[in-house]
Amino acid sequence: MEIAAKSNSKRMYSWWWDSHNTPKNSKWLQDNLADMDSNVKQMIKVLEEDADSFARRAEMYYRKRPELMKLVEEFYRAYRALAERYNHATGVIHKAHETIAEAFPNQVPLIFGDESHGGALTNDVDPQTPDMPPPFRARGNPDEFQQDALGFSLSHVHDVKRNIDFSEEPLFVSNGKARKGLNFNDHGDGKGRNGLKDHILSESERASKAEAEVVALKDSLSKMQAEKQASLALFEKNLERLSNLESEVSRAQADSRGINDRAASAEAEIQTLRETLYKLESEKESSFLQYHKCLQKIADLEDGLSVAHKEAGERASKAETETLALKRSLAKAETDKETALIQYRQCLNTISNLEERLRKAEEDARLINERAEKAGVEVENLKQTVSKLIKDKEASELQFQQCLNIIASLKVKLHHAQEETQSLSHEIEDGVAKLKFSEEKCLLLERSNQNLHSELDSLLEKLGNQSQKLTEKQTELVKLWSCVQAEHLHFQEAETAFQTLQQLHSQSQEELNNLAVELQTVSQIMKDMEMRNNELHEELEQAKVENKGLNDLNFTMEKLVQKNLMLEKSISYLNSELESFRRKLKTFEEACQSLSEEKSCLISENQHNVIENTVLIEWLRQLRLEAVGIATEKTDLEGKAKTIGDKLTDAETENLQLKRNLLSIRSEKHHLEDEITNVKDQLHEKEKEFEEIKMEKEKLIQEVFKERKQVELWESQAATFFCDKQISVVHETLIEATTRELAEACKNLESKSASRDADIEKLKRSQTIVLLNESIKSLEDYVFTHRESAGEVSKGADLMDEFLKLEGMCLRIKAIAEAIMEKEKFLMLENTNTYSMLEASLKQIKELKTGGGRSMRKQDGGSGRMRKQSHETEMVMKDIVLDQTSDGSSYEIVSKKGNSELDHLGFVELKPVKTHKTETKALSEESLIVEKVEIFDGFMDPNREVNKRRVLERLDSDLQKLENLQITVEDLKSKVETVEKEKTKVGENEYKTIKGQLEEGEEAIEKLFTVNRKLTTKAESEKDIDRRRRIFEHARRGTEKIGRLQSEIQRIQFLLMKLEGEREHRLRSKISDTKVLLRDYIYGRTRSVSMKKRTKKRSVFCGCVQQPESP
């Protein structure tokens, strides 16, 4: 029969038996096809099983329906995996053929169409499927599937590359043939030769391009293989994790199956005991009825005893055999009872084991409470650190206010100094008014003074604006303080949430205690069941005694016959009842199977929740890894929080398992006591409890996330407070430097004003002015007398002498006027220097507050020339400090020709003057701080994971720097072009080299602009951490290049300033040859010595720069 069934199945399923041509090249295909074959075999076995009745067939259908559904589901998944793999493979082969066709259009035709099945390749491509990586199942992850598909594409491209290497030989052969053809056609026309040469050149270019593409393909293959190895390592790790999870699931399933088997055996034993009790009670009632009937019939049957005595002996022997059979059945019932007791004891042992597990869970809960208390202590420590930072901030604010008060007092002193300068200027104007010939120059001086007053008014307005800005910043500080208080309130709310978590934990402990009480009630119910069993045993013994009495009384024939008839009827009735009980047992078994399936579904949901929890924990770990570079204490706290979270999750999972086990025990006990309706109600209750636990778990996770976010906010606030403290320290140092400089400037002004007062008094006391007036009057008298006596010849020689004296006096008066003018200019220059120092200090404060370190480059020049030069010298000093801090390797803008031409200009030696010493130090410190903040912000910690926001901020700052550089380069170019338009021969070659360097700088800036745009687009689109790190490294290199460019452009700016200074000096040397100083005239110095000194002084175009001494 079995052979016939197999032959029938082969005939029915010939579509399956005849399709076993499995491929041998791909292990993945072999595994998938083997899985599909096993699924088909199981489905055929399930479908081939048959039954006698229709009800049996229906039962088999409802039993085997879920198995068939599972098999069909797995079959569908395997089919989907094969279809996706086929689609991916065809796409990869299409791409490979397109690239090969582009590289070798004459050798590799595109034959693989859209509807091909992977085998329609030409001789250039290997038709075999490549070897695959480790076996891939249809039920795996989609990431692993993509990795496997990657492996397929890599191996296929490798095969294509081999075919390309084989196909490269005919190219050279064809080239050789073409050359032979060219040799044969040498005697032909010249046009044919040129065409063939062009064709050969084009083919050689194509071959070179193809070789380059092959090299690029090899490089891409190596990269893809490296990525494949990394993905395989990740795949192996995931497989290990899956195997561990499957082993844990199998253990849990084995435990649940053992508990279900024990419960089922206990139920079966209880049902057998009940059946025996019902049988015994029915036999007792029937025996009592028979006894009454027998008593009634004894009188009637005494007459027929003699006749039926022989027959009674035979029937008595038969009855004895039947009683022996009944005794044997009773012995079997007793043995069954003993086995039921043994199983009952085993159930008690399991209950004791569960109680021990509950105790362990309680101990774990205590440990968790202790760890939570430790976490609270750590939170209090964090609060203390935050309060310390707030105190430091308040102290820094007090210091800042003190500095502001000092600045206000210095402003008052400056105002007094300005008033004194105004009074001095008025006195000087009064002294100059006495000289009649210098009125026009005095008017010019008054105009210049008016300009200065307007500039002073503008400076005062600027000071007022700055005070307004300071008030605004004070309001911002008040706002920040309010924000800090609000965050303190948030922290208190987090503490309240933590207390609610503790309350929830106490509630869970109370629930565990309630479960323990319920276990005690269950144990009492078991004791009651034991008492009932003992009572049943006693009733059985009583029934046995009564049966013995009945057997002694029923020796007669009629009684035995009636008894036998009744026994036969009872046996038939019992058989019918047994069949009904068996049907009930079947229904119970089906219900148990459905319950076990629901249990397995719940276990799978639990596993899914555990997997989600693990994914969340890994995500949290990644977030914590990003915060490693902040502080070591924070890492310790995060590690502790991790351990607490893991233990909490373990405790929660264990508590859930214990609750489920207790609920299962309850349901089993209620099974023994109640019917299936109670079991269904309990299942509904379990589902509700499971949903409530899920909700509680989600709430706890949300609260943990909130607390962690609040901790991160506190950490970020602490970092901002620390940065504010550092900025305030920098502010203090800079303000102290500026205050010292202003104090020194005030002292210098006071000393200069005192010396000027003394000079004025000396001039007033001296009689030189009186003598000059008298000489002028005498000269006028002589002139008038000369007009009256023009014809006298005897006085000619005297008049000539007087004219010479008059000319000398005029020259002296001019020298005195020029000396006064120069002195006033000197005073104005000193005033402008002080004002420029004030402006520089205030701008430094602004830059440090706003964070901009390059605003000093864009300041406009003042009204006077020396103010512009002083401002430019400050810029030069800052640029020189930046040149020293930058790398030695420049961006190589300057060409060799430019360097050789600029070497003739000489070296520049920098020596700060005493008055500007502190100013240059402050500028250098500020520039160094700004450059360090700009360049090294974010690059100090290479192990830290990269954030997208930081990369974009870095690129944005680089773009701003490039825009500033572009503006400065355009300004410098415009200056050079204006100098070239003037057509001066001074420094023409130097200006040409500077112009070439500026053009090269513009090209470099444009290249950096393009690189920055590409990096910004990549940073916005990329999501992978490794690629972001690469982008971050490229951005860091770009910032370094920008820094080098800045140093080069600053050097060019310095050279331009030097050339302008030399040019102005040459122009002045031409104009100022005819001037005579009053100082030289009064003290009798020679003009040559004074001019030499003046030329030496004017040759230096900056106060902090000196020319090198002559060797």
UniProtKB/Swiss-Prot annotation:
The reply on keyword Coiled coil is yes
Name a Pfam family for this protein. Answer: KIP1
Coiled-coil spans are: 202-287, 314-605, 642-752, 943-1009
For the region Disordered, give the residue spans.
Answer: 850-870
Entry GO CC? plasma membrane
Q: Does this UniProt record's set of keywords contain Coiled coil?
A: yes
Gene Ontology terms, MF aspect: actin binding
Biological role stated in the UniProt entry: Plant-specific actin binding protein. May be part of a membrane-cytoskeletal adapter complex.
User: Per the similarity annotation, which family is this?
Assistant: Belongs to the NET family.
What is the designated name of this protein? Protein NETWORKED 1C
